[in-house]
Amino acid sequence: DDMKALYAGFDLCSPQTSVSMTINGPAPTVLAFFLNTAIDQQIDRFREENGREPEASERATLRAYALEIVRGTVQADILKEDQGQNTCLFSTDFSLRMMGDIQQYFVAHNVRNFYSVSISGYHIAEAGANPITQLALTLANGFTYVEAYLARGMDIDVFVPNFSFFFSNGMDPEYTVMGRVARRIWAVAMREFYGAGSRSHKLKY
């Protein structure tokens, strides 16, 4: 109900709406609240337009539509929580399983316009890392998620497009090339090591 009140007046399934949630440890719970709110908005619209409750098949169609259309990002980067913020609510293994559960849900329900994780170097830099260390740890975290999701049987070309990245910036000269270097390393690894398709080569930040 709180999430519904928060987004009252916003069409969460509009192409012009994208919601970014900077939440990590509680990400699965908050994301579930958000996605259910988007679904409920579609059901409420159906009631208003048709003057009745949707049937089970209609409700399923509305649910599938909302999940396929809704846009946004949930940070949910548990590894940088441990490395840069020391705020890991759960064990690393358990947190990785929860992140995998989120991505598995996205795959199963064709959630293609929502980033399931924003792999974040910014916080690592704020904790004292120089640009090179920030980049190295952030990419390592990204590859860790790739390996974890592959181990669960997910297709790399289905889940990697749900990844985004987040880096800091500054006056150090390395920052002038960090984005290009990150994209190069990611693309080469996706192509040469993982055999992924061209869409997975794109590091988005």
Kindly label every feature range from the protein language model:
Residues 1-178, 193-196, 200-204:
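Catalytic alpha/beta active-site cores
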